[in-house]
């Protein structure tokens, strides 16, 4: 994790001070995410901006994440880099009942009683949610479009339909 980002952040003090933190986290430091990755090569670039909405009086942290996750393509079983760019505004709430009061554009983040948050956990939570169930590389070998139009040959067209006999019986 970056040297200028404390491991634990007091959410309410950060909101009052309108603090911003920019950091980097190696993928190897995110233990819950590792099971979804092919390997842990690379790092995640993120920023946290604590603030309060002046009109709605909602305390929030704006989370920005840029990373390329090494995933296994489910078509080719080859490693590929899945680009992830997240811009999420998390409304800070003290109690689950406060979630209903949040505007639609805010995602709720329940702050523990002591007010302390871990930046790594917030970033990792969003990355775990961003991993697709069945990742597919955008240009995986063998994933090219197949010609959907099938034109029958003349021989097939000339052959009598097996249903023609049924049609004749139906007319009788």
Could you describe each region identified by the protein language model?
Residues 77:
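Cys/His-coordinated zinc-binding microdomains
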């Amino acid at each position: 994790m970056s040297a200028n980002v404390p491991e634990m952040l007091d959410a309410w003090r950060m909101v009052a001070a309108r603090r911003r933190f920019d950091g980097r986290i190696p993928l190897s430091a995110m233990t819950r995410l590792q099971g979804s990755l092919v390997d842990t090569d690379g790092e995640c670039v993120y920023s946290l901006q604590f603030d309060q909405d002046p009109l709605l009086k909602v305390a929030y942290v704006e989370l920005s994440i840029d990373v390329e996750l090494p995933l296994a393509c489910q078509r080719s079983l080859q490693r590929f880099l899945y680009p992830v760019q997240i811009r999420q505004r998390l409304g800070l709430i003290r109690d689950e009942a406060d979630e209903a009061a949040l505007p639609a554009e805010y995602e709720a983040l329940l702050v523990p009683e002591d007010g302390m948050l871990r930046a790594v956990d917030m970033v990792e939570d969003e990355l775990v949610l961003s991993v697709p169930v069945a990742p597919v590389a955008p240009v995986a070998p063998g994933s090219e479009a197949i010609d959907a139009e099938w034109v029958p040959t003349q021989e097939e067209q000339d052959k009598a339909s097996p249903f023609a006999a049924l049609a004749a019986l139906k007319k009788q």
